Curated annotation (Swiss-Prot):
Protein's organism: Agathobacter rectalis (strain ATCC 33656 / DSM 3377 / JCM 17463 / KCTC 5835 / VPI 0990) (Eubacterium rectale)
Zinc finger (unnamed): 3-34
UniProt-recorded Gene Ontology molecular function terms: ATP binding; DNA binding; zinc ion binding
Record-annotated ATP-cone domain positions: 49-139
Biological classification of the source: Bacteria, Bacillati, Bacillota, Clostridia, Lachnospirales
Family: Belongs to the NrdR family.
Top-level lineage group: Bacteria
InterPro entries for this protein: ATP-cone_dom, NrdR-like_N, RNR_NrdR-like
Cofactors, names only: Zn(2+)
Protein name as it appears in the record: Transcriptional repressor NrdR
Amino acid sequence: MKCPFCSSDNTRVIDSRPADDNSSIRRRRLCDDCGKRFTTYEKVETIPLIVIKKDNNREQYDRSKIEKGVLLACHKRPISADTISKLVDEVEIEIFAREEKEISTSLIGELIMDRLKDLDAVAYVRFASVYREFKDVNTFMTELKKMLDTK
């Protein structure tokens, strides 16, 4: 593995353990040339997953899009980066556990909203407003009432 600091190939693993999600391995590495340490993660290679968009276009699954949407919904909320990462991990695990080659954005959105609803009401409403494309205040209020009725 190349060192991200000096690009040397002369690196070695100094510690290896399961990552927090137990689906990957966290490795601490040391560059023998520059002496700097860095972390890598090893994950099982998964089958390519195709996401079906609302307009029926298809594109390859991209975890960073889920992360970006959740981060935007949680912006300026008292939610740690670890909590957001765990939420994204949970959604991703559930997506891949289905063992399907294609998944719709609507299903991914519902999985995210289910978790955000339990995590933070404001983040949930923010995500839902974009995901469900609220056209006016009335649809927004209807969603708020539904959420408040379930609490």
